[in-house]
Amino acid sequence: MNRYENIFDRLSQRKEGCFVPFVVLGDPSLDTSLKIINILIQNGADALELGIPFSDPLADGKTIQKANLRALSQKNNIFQYFKEIKNLRKKHTQIPIGLLIYANLVYNQGLDNFYLKCRKSGVDSVLIADVPIEESEIFYTTANKYKISSIFICPPNADDDLLYRISLYAKGYIYVLSRPGVTGIENQNFFVSGDFIKKIKKYNSVPLLQGFGISNSIQVKQAISSGLSGVICGSAIINIIEKYLYEEDIMMTKIQEFVKHLKKSTKLIA
């Protein structure tokens, strides 16, 4: 079994959902982001989703856009990011590590070179945020060559044709959107309906994780109890980073408390 299969199997046995925090590598600095990642792991993260900074992150709301800009201002490059991911992997051998990246960054590296770097660094999955499923075959094929899982986004209004397409390619997990649009917590709570979850599961047995706007324990409990395998939480964590940019000790404490609280909410048996 790969790392995703292992973690989902273990969590299922313990009757827990999977908690996946998202942060942007290099935000607010590379050293601080690595401290944050270690705090996330130490306090309940079951897997990681790490954003590679990009100048025009169209799929993301203002919170994550600003995180990308802060990271880009540090003038790090993709080679440094892969180096630090490799160091993370040496320290944390079992946690699944996924990347969220935009297509231009992959093309700039060359597909084979990019996925080879992922493999050598210990990356488990890649989600390319701006590539629709109908244009994904070249990425998926190359990812498979290097045993990297391709993660695909499933919107809440997906029709049968899209669900079928996703079922052909999805590995690791499927990223189920709480709502259409971009990331962030500006909107009211959105819950994925049980009927829609059943519909997705008709096509695929890959675990389903809900993302976009996850910011409190009610949302987490609702997601797990409705049949999803877990949640992805990004903007709420990045808001903490932004709020305490110049108070690192407080930032780390607030992130620790938040992650512990949301991870506790994934447990179906208290």
Swiss-Prot record:
Record: active site: E49, D60
UniProt keyword annotation of Transferase present: no
Cited InterPro entries: Aldolase_TIM, RibuloseP-bd_barrel, Trp_synthase_alpha_AS, Trp_synthase_suA
One Pfam family named in its UniProt record: Trp_syntA
Pathway the protein takes part in: Amino-acid biosynthesis; L-tryptophan biosynthesis; L-tryptophan from chorismate: step 5/5
Similarity comment text for this entry: Belongs to the TrpA family.
HAMAP family: Trp_synth_alpha
Protein name: Tryptophan synthase alpha chain
Organism of origin: Buchnera aphidicola subsp. Diuraphis noxia
